[in-house]
Curated annotation (Swiss-Prot):
Positions with a binding annotation for S-adenosyl-L-methionine: N32, L34, G59, E80, D105, N130
Keyword Lipoprotein: no
Name of the gene: rsmA
Segments traversing the membrane: none
InterPro entries, per the entry: KsgA/Erm (IPR001737), rRNA_Ade_diMease-like_C (IPR023165), rRNA_Ade_Mease_Trfase_CS (IPR020596), rRNA_Ade_methylase_Trfase_N (IPR020598), rRNA_adenine_dimethylase (IPR011530), SAM-dependent_MTases_sf (IPR029063)
Cellular component GO terms held in the UniProt record: cytosol
The protein's Enzyme Commission number: 2.1.1.182
Keywords for this protein: Cytoplasm, Methyltransferase, RNA-binding, rRNA processing, S-adenosyl-L-methionine, Transferase
Protein name stated in the entry: Ribosomal RNA small subunit methyltransferase A
Family assignment from sequence similarity: Belongs to the class I-like SAM-binding methyltransferase superfamily. rRNA adenine N(6)-methyltransferase family. RsmA subfamily.
Function: Specifically dimethylates two adjacent adenosines (A1518 and A1519) in the loop of a conserved hairpin near the 3'-end of 16S rRNA in the 30S particle. May play a critical role in biogenesis of 30S subunits.
CDD domains listed in its UniProt record: AdoMet_MTases
Length: 296
């Protein structure tokens, strides 16, 4: 039975698992194992996981978070890139019949196909993960661009990156990543995780960020690809005005500049403003105005 052994995140059991399988941490995969059961339980609580939910986990490691998810979810599909960990997970998660471990790289995986293969329809879809710091942003953007409708995404990441995701317009942390994420989801930091609860200990603290499906989505831009190009380009040089960044993005010839000025006027945005002052809605309005002027 699952209750006969200490939970996987118990520091003594974590060490025993590492020793049994001769595991060392792969720096190239950004591996840090969490050894505080209360924090794991708080992550699951932040995702509000229930038996109605199918949950995807990225990078289960030795299964500490997976175990907590399995106790509450309908089913868990855990994607693990490190083939050394597959026999470990087969062992540590053997008491839980509602877990499937899939040997996949999240950035190369066909998530829609995996969801269709491993989950029965009729359940809410959530994603919970402790992401490697070095690849957090590419994974998040991959998920948001996938077209998959996640009810909730709860991710542990570097505190500084979490602050950027949840930042409000006009703050130092607000940037293209803030806009890209907040266009799709509502974001908030649930709590901070000190670096001392990891093995090996990272150099910085982490944060748990909760992304929830928007109850009221902003109006969609006429050209989503252009909208994303505009957002990225507007923050190209943070200290420069939006106008300077627009010229770098679209060109400085008189006709283009005139069209850009007209688009700014239509969107009711001042020429001298910096990108960090614009809301998601402002960027959508400006993108639509530029497209209408033939700039994309």
């Amino acid at each position: 039975m699952a209750n006969e052994l200490p939970e996987i995140a118990n520091p003594t059991r974590t060490r025993a698992i590492m020793e049994t399988y001769g595991l060392t941490f792969k720096k190239s995969l950004g591996q840090n194992f969490l050894t505080d059961i209360n924090i794991l339980k708080n992550i699951v609580a932040a995702a509000e996981v229930s038996e109605e939910d199918n949950v995807i986990e990225i990078g289960p490691g030795i299964g500490a978070l997976t175990e907590q998810l399995a106790k509450r979810a309908n089913k868990v599909m855990a994607l693990e890139i490190d083939d050394r960990l597959l026999p470990v997970l087969a062992d540590t998660l053997s008491p839980y019949e509602n877990v499937e471990v899939v040997h996949q790289d999240i950035l190369k995986a066909d998530l829609k196909a995996l969801i269709a293969e491993h989950f029965e329809p009729g359940h809410k879809l959530k994603l919970v993960a402790n992401l490697p710091y070095y690849i957090t942003t590419p994974i998040l953007m991959h998920l948001l661009d996938s077209g998959i409708e996640f009810e909730t995404i709860v991710v542990m990441m570097q505190k500084e990156v979490a602050e950027r995701l949840a930042a409000n317009p006009g703050t130092k942390a607000y940037g293209s990543l803030s806009v890209a994420v907040q266009y799709e989801m509502d974001s908030e930091i649930a709590f901070i995780v000190p670096k001392t609860v990891f093995v090996p200990q990272p150099n910085v603290d982490s944060a748990i960020i909760v992304l929830n499906k928007k109850k009221v989505k902003p109006k969609e831009p006429q050209d989503e690809k252009h909208f994303k190009k505009l957002v990225k380009g507007s923050f190209m040089h943070r200290r420069k005005s939006l106008w300077n960044n627009l010229q770098s993005l679209y060109g400085k010839d008189p006709e283009t500049k005139e069209k850009m000025l007209q688009a700014l006027e239509v969107a009711d945005i001042k020429q001298s403003i910096r990108a960090e002052k614009l809301t998601v809605a402002d960027f959508i309005n400006l993108s639509d105005a530029l497209v209408k002027m033939g700039i994309n």
